[in-house]
Design a protein with these regions (language model features):
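Alpha-helical segment of the N-proximal tetratricopeptide repeat
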Residues: 1-27, 33, 37-44
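Position-specific recognition of the canonical hydrophobic site in helix A of tetratricopeptide repeat
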Residues: 9, 43, 70, 74-77, ...
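Helix-start (N-cap) detector for alpha-helical repeat units in TPR-like alpha-solenoids
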Residues: 32-33, 66-67, 100-101, 134-135
Length: 155
């Protein structure tokens, strides 16, 4: 049933997918793969508060779940709660220090806070792990552009 729900979500049949995730969770409330997939589907539907609650439920079951930490972080980032998002990414990095996605996401939040030098460090670290990681490449380029424009304004 979980695979069927995932297929529905992939086909953007979100409401039907949520119904199946709920069926799985009704019989097994601690099924973390279902919680994570449901949270991601709710996030795609724009139901961010429900998604946030679902990620928190997954983290109650497993506080070191990397997918839940990243998902929760991206929701916080979208709400402009960048410091809180960074806490989620830092928690993920404590568990898995060479985690390109967590580094790139942290870089994005740092960039939004105007901490471009720190953001650039995160993007570069992410790219040493995965040189083709699009989010890190785009973030690095944007940070470099912004730093260059700041320097040109000073002179």
């Amino acid at each position: 049933m979980l695979e069927q729900a995932s297929d529905l979500a992939e086909d953007q049949e979100y409401d039907e997918a949520i119904l199946l995730y709920d069926k799985v969770l009704h019989s097994d409330p601690k099924n973390n793969p279902s919680l994570l997939d449901k949270a991601a589907t709710l996030q795609r539907m724009g139901k961010n508060s429900q998604s946030f609650q679902t990620y928190n439920s997954a983290l109650k079951e497993d506080s070191k779940n990397l997918d839940a930490l990243i998902g929760k972080g991206t929701l916080l980032h979208a709400k402009s709660k960048f410091s809180d998002a960074i806490e989620c990414y830092d928690s993920a990095l404590k568990i898995k220090p060479r985690f390109a996605m967590a580094l790139a996401c942290k870089g994005m939040s740092l960039g939004e806070m105007g901490e471009l030098d720190s953001a650039l460090v995160c993007f570069k670290k992410a790219l040493t792990i995965d040189k083709d990681y699009d989010l890190a490449n785009m973030g690095k380029q944007k940070a470099l552009e912004l730093l260059k424009s700041q320097k040109s304004k000073k002179y």
